[in-house]
Amino acid sequence: MNKTYLSANTLFHFTNNIDNIINILTNEFSPRYCMESFEFLGGCDLEIAIPMVCFCDIPLSQIKNHIENYGGYAIGLSKEWGVSKGINPVAYSIKNSLSTKAISNVINIINRECEDEQKKNDIDNAYDFMCNFVFYMKPYEGNSWNKEKFDGKYTRFYDEREWRYIPDIDVIKKYNIDWFLEKEEFLDYKGRREYNNKISEIIKLSFEPDDIKYIIVNSEDEILDLFRAIDNIKGDKYSLNRINILKTRIISKDQILNDF
């Protein structure tokens, strides 16, 4: 008997318009600052924006809700590609659980030890490593971000099976990139755009055509438009054969909802 899996062999990155798809195919992925709430750690109401590229590990047959929440456009790449690039599944956490309390306690201990200047360098490094782990955490469920605060649709985030790419802390430090933005900085649209532009010029999450398993567009009418865009943006970089294979991987949202 063949073994079946709940997860997919493809990591999907969803977006809300075809221009974003074309931009990714042209310039590859770049991290963008996204708001996250760490209230689930307890004892704090921390809300900050972290640079990341998000994916979901959901089979096409179960992707309807994700399309409704995140848009009818997506690029799906092989999970092998994701693992090779250091993309990691999110650790979902429940407030007041033993594991969440353990993380919170470690953070509190590190903060207290920072008062000792002799230990400051070691503690700073430990704090960086801990933050790097925490940035891959997400509450099991809660309100989604809605323009200015977390008062959007109540969502069981666990069902999204999120994977994240977050830039390595050494790269962040080398290029003097902000590891996170305070909420006020994120809400400043002009400032946020400058932060996103800076990081996109330095950090790329690259891929090859063979890594792409699906390109999802909202309607079949857009497939021919995307054909032409692929010819224009990849013609100098990829062979005609690879471009033609890539075109066969375009599918519409309607096909998914009707056939899977």
For each of these PLM feature ranges, what is it?
Residues M1-F260:
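NAD-dependent ADP-ribosyltransferases
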